[in-house]
Structure formats: structure tokens, C-alpha cells
Curated annotation (Swiss-Prot):
GO terms for molecular function: NADH dehydrogenase (ubiquinone) activity; NADH:ubiquinone reductase (non-electrogenic) activity; quinone binding. Belongs to the complex I subunit 2 family. Its EC number is 7.1.1.-. Coiled coil: none annotated. NCBIfam families: NDH_I_N. This is NADH-quinone oxidoreductase subunit N. The gene is nuoN. It is an enzyme of class 7 (translocase). It comes from Desulforamulus reducens (strain ATCC BAA-1160 / DSM 100696 / MI-1).
Amino acid sequence: MEFNFALITTELALFILGLATFVLGLLVPSHSRRGLGSFALLGLLLVLGITIINWSNQGVLLDGMYLVDQYATFFKILCLISAILVVLGSFRYIDKQVGNQFEYYSTVIFTTLGMVVMASAGDFITLYLGLELMTISFVILVAFRSFEAKSLEAGMKYILLAGLSSAVLLYGLSLVYGATGTILIGEVAREIADKGSTPLLIVGVVMLVAGLGFKISAVPFHMWSPDVYEGAPTPVTSFLAVGSKAASFAVLLRLFAGGFGGIQEQWTLLVAVLAALSMLIGNLVAIPQTNIKRMLAYSSIAQAGYIMVGLVSATEAGIKGVMFYAFLYVFATIGAFTVVAIVSNQTNSDEIRDYAGLIQRAPLAASVMLICLLSMAGIPPLAGFVGKFYLFKTVVENHMWLVYLGLIMSMVSVYYYLRVALVMFRDEPKESAPIHVGGAATITLVITMVATIILGIYPGPLAEVANMAAQSFLLK
């Protein structure tokens, strides 16, 4: 069978780009290495263009081990946009924080490669390889500020708990293989349709939920998030909050809506309970936080709960809702964390009280932070409102209690988001000196703000693309 390399141009381009960035970093003089950030950015933009051009290019490789469909391409585009915005927002922060910038940028690229492999994984081996490439790369990024104890502590916590979750996930995959006799996700679906469920299969599914629950920071597998988010470099935190979740939800949908769709009634309640706990605990624990990165960490736990609502239905509408909301979530989250990086770079603090009078010191940053926080709260007419509408609509008939809980928790989130807004807009600044934003960070802020507003007012094109991607789901 002839191998069609055209189907993996995104993966090949990312591998070459990551390798080239690293090798060039070793060859060029240290004073010239800052330009490698621009090189990585241009390369990622090129890869994004290639991926968009190949939107209609679909196929199956390696007898079903690698699936290239519009569903996978959608998540690849999402992960690439995340990487581009993170790199763009990293220039000033990374130049100040670390010396070997080329290692940072090449690791971001290889992290993205792991994510896109996960999006196309059609079997357990490919899934695990992509997951581990992403996880190991994130370990390097989280501990990148090795001269700071907090960053090293975050890296140590992440590698230990990530290793544990990977072990649980791998054991769950082995149990599913033992129950079905295949590692191909499509074949798993057919085996379940023919033979039904077994206790061994159910245990395997539960372990998969636990392993992937760590990656998306779902309760009760969320305990690592606040410490790691706080200790990691802020651009890495934003990438961890959006890229890791996007790739993990791509896998979750493949496995549960595709592979385990035949036993949906046996795992729906489990996922619904985890979604409810994530919304509840994430929002409630965010209220007393005084560190903005920890507050956003708990907020991201709640956001994972909202996205899991779409997984509960596991229908085409649910898949569309997950994809739509994940896309919106990228812009709001990266926009907020970019502001955090800008303020931290100037004040060396992540405390909410140090955002006092930000509207006077950095008007654009304060405005973008407000818009992103309101979007995450689901305030119309911003994008987050539309995304939550699509998600909650999928469970109205069978799980109305999730809709009520989601609406209540969204109102709770308004409290702690507006608390930050009041500090920025009402309180007087401790210092009058303006905060320098920088050209690259300004571009990131403008992109995230404009996308959050436009996708809320005019969501039709994105909804149509998400619908096309959901319909292309190859696992029948």
C-alpha cells in the first residue's frame, strides 16, 4: 500500500521547523539567537497556511493507525494558532527570563507536533506517542526558568503527576485492548457493537477517563494545575491551558464519541459528574484566590467542565459544540495570559492587587483583559456566550441539571472576573509609570480581542467549519 506523504505535510513541516530552530540556535552566535523567535513564528505561520490549504485533503494511513480528516485538521489548526499566539506573546518575556531562547521556541514547536499527532491518532500506540511527546515537551517548558525554585518545583510536580497519569492511561488502553483484541479505535467500536461491554472494558474506560482527566485538569485530577500554572513561565502556562486541553479533547472525542459510542450509557454519567464537579469546584475555589495565575488555573478547570458538557451528549451537535468552544477558549485564555505576562514582566508580581489602575498604565492590556474575562464568564455578545449556548443546547433534553449548574456557575464566575476588572479600572495605581507592552505582545492582544468580539457577534462561519469537521468524523 502506497504511503501518501501529502497527508502528513503538517507533521513533517513541524518536525523540520523544530529541528531547524534548534540546530540554528546551536550554530549562530548567542547575540543573534533572539531572531530565532521570529524564525519560529514565520515557520509556524507557514505550517498553518499549509494546514488550511490541506483542509479538504482526507485519508487513512497505516491501515487506520493515522486518520486525516477535517476533524483532525480543525484541531491541528487550533493547536497551531495557539502556538503562534504563544510564540508571539513570548518575545519580551522569554528574552528577559531565560538565556537560551532557541531551546524554548524549538520545544514549543515539538509540543505542537505532539498535539497534532494526537488529533490524528487512530490507534492506541499513535495516541500514546503523541501524548508523551506533548507531555515531555511541556515538562521542559514548565521548568524552563531553572534558576527559580518555583519553576523547578512546578516542573517536578508536573513530571511526577504526568508520569502517573500516563501510566494509568496506558494501563487503561491495555485493558481495552484485552477486552476487544484490537488497538485500532475504529475496530474497538465495531467489536463493542458486535459483543457489547464487559467488566474488563468498563474498567479500562474508567482508567482512560482518569488518565485523560489529568491532561484537561478535570476534577478530581486537577490538583497539579494551580501550582504548575503559577510556577511555569506565563506564556507556557497559557499554552498548557489551551493547547494541552485542545489536543486532549480531540482524543477524548475520538475515543468516546467514536470508539466507545456503543456503550455510551455506561460512561455518560461518569463524564457528566466530572463535568459538574469541574464547573463547581473550579469556580468556587477561584473566588478567594489573590494570585491571578492561580485564579486563572481554577478558571481553566471550570472551563474544562463546560467543554465536557458537549462530550456528555457525544452526538454530532455535541462534537460541534466542543470544537466551537475550544476554538473560542484559545483566544480568550491566551489574551488573558498575555496581559499577565506583560504585567509580570514589569512588576515581577502576579498578585491581583498589583493590577490596580492598569487602565491608566496600560489601557490596551486592561481592555483586553476585561474582554477576555467577560468572554470566559459567558457575557453576551462576546464569543464565550455563544460557545456556552452551543454546549448547553446539546444536553437540554437528557441532562437539564447540567445546564442549570452551568448557568449558576457562570454567574458565580462573573464575581471573581469582575473583581479583577474593578481592581484594574477603579483602584488607583501604586506607580504612575506606564507599562510597556511591546510590538509583538500588542499584536497578540489585538488578535485575541478582535477574535473574541467578532466570533461572538458573527459566529456563523466558525460554526459552519466546526459542523463540517464534526460530520467528517471517520470513525463510523
